C-alpha cells in the first residue's frame, strides 16, 4: 500500500513539473516578471554562499560516507544517464515496473521529503534559501569521493550550455567528484555555480531568465540531513552492486556455568529487553491440544535477549512447575546425602590384614591334622545297588514239600479235580479226610452213638465198622420209626 501511494504522489508531483506546450514555463507561475537589477544583485550573493556551503557539505559527506555503508541496493537507479528528467524518471511504466519488482533498496515513501510548492515562484538568483546543489547536509550529489558517475559521461543532473532563449535548457558532460555532481552555468543565463542534488533534482529545467519554470528547490530538514544509515557509499562498489545490511559484530562470552549462553550483545541492547517474549506452543498437532501444554505455556516464556538461549534459561528446569512455592529456594537434600551412613569405628586396627590371613590359614591346617589323627582310616567301599546285590545271591531250588507220612496209593483215595472242588458244591457230605467217601452230607441226621467214635483227621475210616453201624442205625431207626 505504501509503495502504490508513494508512486501516485511522485507521479502527481512530477506532472506538475512538466512544461506547457507553449514553452518551458510552468502554468503555476504567478510571478513571471522580475526586475533585472534585483536579480543580478542576488546572483552574486548566492554564488558566494553556495561556494561556502558546498565546501562544508563536501567535507561533512566525506566523513559520514567513510563510516556508514550504502543502504541502497542499486546505486545508479536515480542517476542513470538514460533518464532525461525527474518527470520521466519517476513516472511512467518503467518506474512502476522497478518498484513492483523490488528494484528499490528503500521504500518509495522517502520521496515525500522532496517538498515543492508550485506557488512558490522565487527565482534561482533571488532565492534566500540554499540553491540546488548547495544543501547543508551530505546529500548524494555532493560527494567528494570518486563515484560511478564521476566520469565525463552526460549525467542527468549536471548541465552547462547556452540558455539565452527564454526557458531554454541544455545538456553537457557532467564532471564532479561525486555521483551526479557537476558544475556550470544554468540555462537561461543563470550564473549560479554549485553541486547538484543528484538524483533528487534534474537541472535540465533549471530556472533562468524568461518564462521558464521557476520554483523553490529548498529541501526540508529531513532530506537535507538524512540519517547515517541512508547515505550511500560508492567507494568499493561497482555499477550494479547489491547492498547488504551491516551485521552487528557479535562477541562470544565465556560462561562458567553449564549450558549454551548464546551470543554476546551490547549492554544498551540488553537493557531494553525487559519484556517477555511469548513462545509458540511446542506441538502443532496433538501437543497443542493437551491441557498440560496450555497450562504450562506461560512458564516457557524467556526474556528476549537478556539470558541467552532457551536451553540455558531452563537448564535447571521450569521455574515453579513442580512446586507450589515458586519463590522458595531449591532443597539441598539429595538421595545420596540421605542414604549415607558414616562409619562407626574410626580407630585403626591393632594388627594388619596379612597377619589375620596367616592366622586363619594356620588354624585350618591344624584342624585338619587333629581330625586325621582322631578318626580311623576308612576303606573305600564299593558302591553297590540293591538290584546288583540281589542278583548275585544263590536261589533255593523250588519243589514239592517233604511228605509228613508214608502214603499208600492202594488204600488212599487219589486227589482229583472233583475232590478238590467237592467242598464248594452244595449238599455234599462233609469231607474230613482224604479217604472220606464221596457222598451226601448227613451230619445233621447221624445218630449220636454213631458220631461218638469218629476218626481223627488223617486217619483212615473203618468202612466195615462204619457200614455195620450205619446199617444197624438205619434198622433201629426204621424200627423205632415203625414202632412209633
UniProtKB/Swiss-Prot annotation:
Bias (Low complexity) ranges: 20-32, 125-160
Organism for this UniProt entry: Bos taurus (Bovine)
Record field: compositional bias (Gly residues): 161-195, 475-484
Assigned GO CC terms: acrosomal vesicle; axonemal A tubule inner sheath; axonemal microtubule; cytoplasm; microtubule organizing center; nucleus; sperm flagellum; spindle
GO BP field: cell differentiation; flagellated sperm motility; positive regulation of transcription by RNA polymerase II; single fertilization; spermatogenesis
InterPro entries per the UniProt record, alphabetical: Sperm-assoc_Ag8
Stretches for region Disordered: 1-32, 123-221, 324-348, 455-484
UniProt keyword Cytoplasm, yes or no: yes
Name of the protein in its database record: Sperm-associated antigen 8
Principal localisation: cytoplasm
Annotated localization: Cytoplasm; Nucleus; Cytoplasmic vesicle, Secretory vesicle, Acrosome; Cytoplasm, Cytoskeleton, Microtubule organizing center
Basic and acidic residues composition bias: residue spans: 1-11
Any single Pfam family the record assigns to this protein: CFAP143
Keywords (A to Z) from UniProt: Cell cycle, Cell projection, Cilium, Cytoplasm, Cytoplasmic vesicle, Cytoskeleton, Differentiation, Fertilization, Flagellum, Nucleus, Spermatogenesis
Ranges of biased composition (kind: Polar residues): 324-339
Subunit organization: Microtubule inner protein component of sperm flagellar doublet microtubules. Interacts with FHL5 (via second LIM domain). Interacts with RANBP9.
Function: Microtubule inner protein (MIP) part of the dynein-decorated doublet microtubules (DMTs) in cilia axoneme, which is required for motile cilia beating. Plays a role in spermatogenesis by enhancing the binding of CREM isoform tau to its coactivator FHL5 and increasing the FHL5-regulated transcriptional activation of CREM isoform tau. Involved in the acrosome reaction and in binding of sperm to the zona pellucida. Plays a role in regulation of the cell cycle by controlling progression through the G2/M phase, possibly by delaying the activation of CDK1 which is required for entry into mitosis.
Reported tissue expression: Expressed in trachea multiciliated cells.
Lineage: Eukaryota, Metazoa, Chordata, Craniata, Vertebrata
